[in-house]
Amino acid sequence: MKTPRLPIAIQQAVMRRLRENLAQANLKLDRHYPEPKLVYTQRGTSAGTAWLESYEIRLNPVLLLENIDTFIAEVVPHELTHLLVWKHFGRKAPHGKEWKWMMESVLGVPARRTHQFALQSVRRNTFPYHCQCQQHQLTVRRHNRVVRGEAVYRCVHCGEPLVAG
């Protein structure tokens, strides 16, 4: 899938949110953390990722276009918080108590670990598997692990191993 071009107004709204959250954090923490690099290269089902060493936030342009308001309100501060925690506390658990505190107490945003966006447009091919009670769809990665004998996946309901087909 080709990466969509983001309208400049959306990019500006993302940058505005990033700068507002960063200014708020700098004020509350009495620090002067720099503005991270922001790129729109995240692919797959992740809404975004924070790259600590390069001090960079990568956002998924497809999910952003499909969920503009919620994405800007939740994903941008979520990823910024990872960078702020790293700068403020050093390397910590990705969604640990420091991250939760930074999200809720410093930025005033609910600390959610995962997004709830529809993923049909970004999901890759899946492979049908079944157990005794239902049909399942495994990702390419999981399917390949089964084929190579590296993994056996089980149904969370009946506990039976999943079988291709």
Curated annotation (Swiss-Prot):
Cofactor dependency: Zn(2+)
Q: Which domain of life is it from?
A: Bacteria
User: A Pfam family matched by this chain, by name?
Assistant: Zn_ribbon_SprT
For this UniProt record, the keywords arranged alphabetically read as follows: Cytoplasm, Metal-binding, Zinc
The answer to whether keyword Cytoplasm applies is: yes
- Where does the SprT-like domain start and stop, copy by copy? 22-163
* Matches recorded under InterPro entries: SprT-like_domain, SprT_Zn_ribbon, Uncharacterised_SprT
Family the UniProt entry places it in: Belongs to the SprT family.
Q: What does the cofactor field's note say?
A: Binds 1 zinc ion.
The cysteines covalently paired via disulfide bonds are none
Protein name, as recorded: Protein SprT
Which Gene Ontology cellular-component terms appear in the entry?
Answer: cytoplasm
Q: Which GO molecular function annotations are given, in alphabetical order?
A: zinc ion binding
The record's section on HAMAP family has:
SprT (MF_00746)
> Which BP terms from GO are recorded?
response to stress
